């Protein structure tokens, strides 16, 4: 039993001495990889358009050799943070959110122009840009301070039937007004013509004395 116990205690230090260099090497290789930070900058405030579209630029500090980048849009509400959209792209290719129509974006160097669509007033909040340099190692991750996006819902459009009634009323008023103006104008024209006629038509007899008894004057009254 003593021999077994000695052999048992002798094996443990030997295994530990063999595995310790591998563990140390593994730690030295991977611990720095996950501990590197990166700065990301984004505007403090953005006002969405009347159509619910907001855009801003997320700029990150690049090491110069990043080939694969992942961009994530986060929304912070109180103490909770939810993912709005995310996309992974290579530097040679264009940034595209394939599985989400809410977000669109373009990339240029270490700048990413992000656009969020379909925002409503209840979507007002702090939106944070998170950038990860995935490949090649080392792995970098950076998060911006957040962009406060304000969304104002547009005023509802009036009822189309109500607009049609207003248009019909205005058209009818213009028609009757033009009809009245025309009637008044015609009445004034007729009144201007009436003084030109005397109301009595006299037929003059011939000047010769021989025809004096053949023609008698007469008149036509005009009411």
Curated annotation (Swiss-Prot):
Residues 39-140 form the Ig-like V-type domain. Homodimer; disulfide-linked. Binds to CD80/B7-1 and CD86/B7.2. Interacts with ICOSLG. It is a single-pass type I membrane protein. N-glycosylation is important for dimerization. Glycans are attached at residues 113, 145. The chain crosses the membrane at residues 162-182. Residues 1-35 form the signal peptide. Disulfide bonds join 58-129, 85-103. It is found in: Cell membrane. Residues 183-223 are cytoplasmic. It comes from the Eukaryota. GO terms for cellular component: external side of plasma membrane; plasma membrane. Residues 46-50, 150-155 are annotated as: Homodimerization. It comes from Canis lupus familiaris. Inhibitory receptor acting as a major negative regulator of T-cell responses. The affinity of CTLA4 for its natural B7 family ligands, CD80 and CD86, is considerably stronger than the affinity of their cognate stimulatory coreceptor CD28. The modification Phosphotyrosine is found at residue 201. This is Cytotoxic T-lymphocyte protein 4. Keywords: Adaptive immunity, Cell membrane, Disulfide bond, Glycoprotein, Immunity, Immunoglobulin domain, Membrane, Phosphoprotein, Signal, Transmembrane, Transmembrane helix. GO terms for biological process: adaptive immune response; B cell receptor signaling pathway; negative regulation of regulatory T cell differentiation; regulation of T cell proliferation; T cell receptor signaling pathway. Residues 134-139 are annotated as: Important for interaction with CD80 and CD86. Residues 36-161 are extracellular. InterPro entries: CTLA4 (IPR008096), CTLA4/CD28 (IPR040216), Ig-like_dom_sf (IPR036179), Ig-like_fold (IPR013783), Ig_V-set (IPR013106).
